[in-house]
Every structure is written in structure tokens, then in C-alpha cells.
UniProtKB/Swiss-Prot annotation:
HAMAP family: SmpB. SUPFAM superfamilies: Small protein B (SmpB). One of its GO terms (cellular component) is cytosol. GO terms for molecular function: RNA binding. One of its GO terms (biological process) is trans-translation. Keywords: Cytoplasm, RNA-binding. Pfam families: SmpB. It is found in: Cytoplasm. Its main location: cytoplasm. This is SsrA-binding protein. The keyword NAD does not apply. Required for rescue of stalled ribosomes mediated by trans-translation. Binds to transfer-messenger RNA (tmRNA), required for stable association of tmRNA with ribosomes. tmRNA and SmpB together mimic tRNA shape, replacing the anticodon stem-loop with SmpB. tmRNA is encoded by the ssrA gene; the 2 termini fold to resemble tRNA(Ala) and it encodes a 'tag peptide', a short internal open reading frame. During trans-translation Ala-aminoacylated tmRNA acts like a tRNA, entering the A-site of stalled ribosomes, displacing the stalled mRNA.
Length: 155
């Protein structure tokens, strides 16, 4: 019998600013508690990561600052676009993240939303902030790598 190919999870949205502004130390996968109209909006890709971050309250992790646009074809039951959404993580993962954020001055940022086996998952990253100088160095390093790759391809 032939083996089935594993499909890579299809991305809904990426947080491009996070890769530019933060250096990732560790990444995790978390589930989200969503309402039906939020899922339908996410299937259409109507989400914005602009000011998203993870907040810890009473032993729970919450996704704050993510805008999921209202679903057009919903009736009278519409979700609130900017409400905080609970993350589904194990208690030990939450404790570990919370302690590292408090001790080392790191932050937890959302990286991407994607479908995994019919469920919507959020990739979060424990990250260290970059300053402007580090960002410029990173851009220079990428430009140099791109130029050398281009020259090697032409050689």
C-alpha cells in the first residue's frame, strides 16, 4: 500500500513585521478558541496581525490585538473583531513562557495562522526585540548573501 503524502499546513496569514522586529528564540504551536463567524472570516483571509501580542492572565494565555474582520454573510450573531482570544496551551507551556518573559525580558509574539488537519492553529514565538541598528545589519547581510548567490549562479 502506498504511503500518503503529508500535506504542509496551509497558511492563512503571516506576521511579517515580527520577523523584522524580533529575533526568535523558540516557536510553539497553539490552538485558538474561536467563534463560528471568526473561522469563516479566517477562511477568507480577513485577519490583521498589526499589533498582536500574547498576554498572560491567571494562568491562561490570551491573544490580544489581532483584528479578525466581521463575516459578511453572518446574520444577527456577529463576533467582535478585536476581542481577546484564548490560546490553547498546556499549563506547563504557559508557565514556561510566562517565567521566561518575566525573567529574561523576552516577549511572545504571534507569527502565523494556519490550518492543520481542519483546525486553526497559531504559531507563536518567544522573541527578543531587535533595535534599529541590528535590523540594518540584518538587511545588509541579506543583501550580501543575495548578491553572492546571484554571482555564483552567473558563474
Amino acid at each position: 500500500m502506498a504511503k500518503k503524502k503529508k500535506k504542509s499546513p496551509s497558511s492563512i496569514a503571516l506576521n511579517k513585521q515580527a520577523r523584522r522586529n524580533y529575533e526568535f528564540v523558540e516557536t510553539l504551536e497553539a490552538g485558538l478558541v474561536l467563534k463560528g463567524t471568526e473561522v469563516k472570516s479566517l477562511r477568507q483571509g480577513l485577519v490583521s496581525f498589526m499589533d498582536g501580542y500574547i498576554n498572560f492572565k491567571e494562568g491562561e494565555a490570551w491573544l490580544v490585538g489581532i483584528h479578525i474582520a466581521p463575516y459578511d454573510h453572518a446574520g444577527y450573531t456577529q463576533h467582535e473583531p478585536d476581542r481577546p482570544r484564548k490560546l490553547l496551551l498546556h499549563a506547563r507551556e504557559i508557565e514556561k513562557l510566562q517565567s521566561r518573559v518575566e525573567q529574561k525580558g523576552l516577549t511572545v509574539v504571534p507569527v502565523r495562522l494556519y490550518f492543520s488537519r481542519g483546525k486553526i492553529k497559531l504559531e507563536i514565538a518567544l522573541a527578543k526585540g531587535r533595535n534599529v541598528h541590528n535590523r540594518k545589519e540584518e538587511l545588509k547581510r541579506r543583501d550580501i548573501a543575495r548578491d553572492t548567490a546571484r554571482q555564483l549562479a552567473n558563474y
